[in-house]
């Protein structure tokens, strides 16, 4: 199990890297994260929902994503509450205090998934959450040492040296663990080091002597590493000579921002993430992204004055695309009579298209293939749906996508406006296909000659790059000994 001294220490990336290392060596390996909190999620083949990081780790392990890889997923929908997803299915919305009391039930789900996977795979590579040393969260912990103790799992702790204070982070984390938990820690990994490693050696020697734990590797800072991000959005990517300029509205509960990864990777496409207090710049396309709390984010959008700016953008020839919750915002109204996402029950939309949306208790989760209707062309594309809502209205008679087959029986999705300036879809992952991306770019500018990035090929290159780094800078032989020695002790 990989645990971290802090959030964003490198746990997800290290687990993905090790998944690829051991998969390349012929092991039947799977990722596992007992509990994840994230707004970026993925849909499994059986119609379940897991964290995006575990889907990436599954790709690294060369296996299909499945719900057991992430039995508990928490999707925040307010500052104090989240939707609780167990074994891929949404159970309910809970405030933090209520979920704390629910953890014993959640642990049963975690152990059920663990036991099923342990029977099928040679090796489970487990990712912790946050830090194991959060004193206020240690009671009934299911994400870090609580899980490790329950299943008797050895632990490696990773820390990010680029943030500073790496020795204090590692020693302090270890000191706050119980004796049995300290014994479970088999070594450290230092992440994102840049500079002369010889200047770090005295610190590494001291750390090993002081703690009695080996340093299993010092991973270098990998520049331009681009993999599916779970939480953070890299917004500093402004290009001065881009052929196409796109604005993405950074609403507070933005979800599945990995939709835009393929666009961000292209050297001739400029993505402007428009944040609080910022105006929408002069761009070719404004995107309203997915949201985990659509009504709240719609209110935020209006308070920012973006509704007026979007209409001005359209008057001056710009185009607008709404994805999932962003599409719902483009209609006449959004209704949430059951309080699926918030206490707000109804709000007028931007009224840029003639339809209404109603949030429902049943969440639609599916991987689909569709035909995109754009530029008088029919383009085959694929993606995934994650939404708790149904849209109805006149505008949907001119759909953006059509389905030959859909798990829920739908024949079409979204809309394209009569003036060809506004489009909406529930489909995530649209830009992951180069052919679909090219048609959307041609929708913006008919003379577009950009060759879009193949995101799947790029992802594979990055995973192999990570694996090669670990083979060089990690003591893989020692990690294998930890695993084999632990298994030997358990079978005595």
Swiss-Prot record:
Coiled coil: none annotated. It comes from the Bacteria. Keywords: Cobalamin biosynthesis, Glutamine amidotransferase. GO terms for molecular function: ABC-type vitamin B12 transporter activity; catalytic activity. PROSITE patterns: GATASE_COBBQ. This is Cobyric acid synthase. Catalyzes amidations at positions B, D, E, and G on adenosylcobyrinic A,C-diamide. NH(2) groups are provided by glutamine, and one molecule of ATP is hydrogenolyzed for each amidation. Residues 243-436 form the GATase cobBQ-type domain. CDD domains: CobQ_N, GATase1_CobQ. The active site is at residues 324, 428. Pathway: Cofactor biosynthesis; adenosylcobalamin biosynthesis. It comes from Pseudoalteromonas translucida (strain TAC 125). Gene3D superfamilies: 3.40.50.880, P-loop containing nucleotide triphosphate hydrolases. Belongs to the CobB/CobQ family. CobQ subfamily. GO terms for biological process: cobalamin biosynthetic process.
